[in-house]
Amino acid sequence: MAYPANWIVSGGIVLSFAEYEDFLDTDKRVFEANEGLTETLIEDSATKATNRILAKIRTTAWWQTIFMRLASQNQITQTQTLSTPYVPLPSANNIQERQADFTDLCVYLTLYDYVYPMIADFNNVDSAEVQKIAVFRTKYNELFQELIDDGSWYDFSGDGTITDLERMPTRTNLVRVR
């Protein structure tokens, strides 16, 4: 499988959708002003963010539907629980399209959930870091929903090509609650 050069891969397993340079490209000033934000710290946080992204994908109706539709009976039986099938995490190795969007998704989640909370002054709601948390959270949520709605980036069979059966766009109806 071909992975983007900026994904962190070890032993053929994707660990992170982003590397340190991706964060510098997104918001270099935060790293210049905060010397404690080391490459190791950021890439470890990006690995955690990648795992959280995959866990969130697992909870979507899109992933549950595609798994139940395309999984073999053996795969379904192996993941069966007492009442419903347990849907496993999608494999980061099988993401074949929109890989740059997954890099952006990882960067946004890492910045708003790990990096900025370390340096933000939450006593001052007008601080730039607190506002950037909100900006990156919004970008993350919008891009995540766009990827799920697109539904055409995952190679379920792992054979290196995405077939028409594996492409499953969805439509999410957002409901306003008053």
Annotate the PLM regions.
Residues 103-116:
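Extended, hydrophobic/aromatic-rich amphipathic alpha-helical segments that build helical scaffolds
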Residues 143-154:
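Amphipathic alpha-helical coiled-coil segments
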Residues 124-145:
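Short secondary-structure subsegments characteristic of cysteine-rich extracellular domains
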Residues 1-100, 155, 159-178:
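Conserved short "hinge" loops at termini or chain/domain junctions
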Residues 115-126:
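Short helix-capping/linker segments at secondary-structure and domain boundaries
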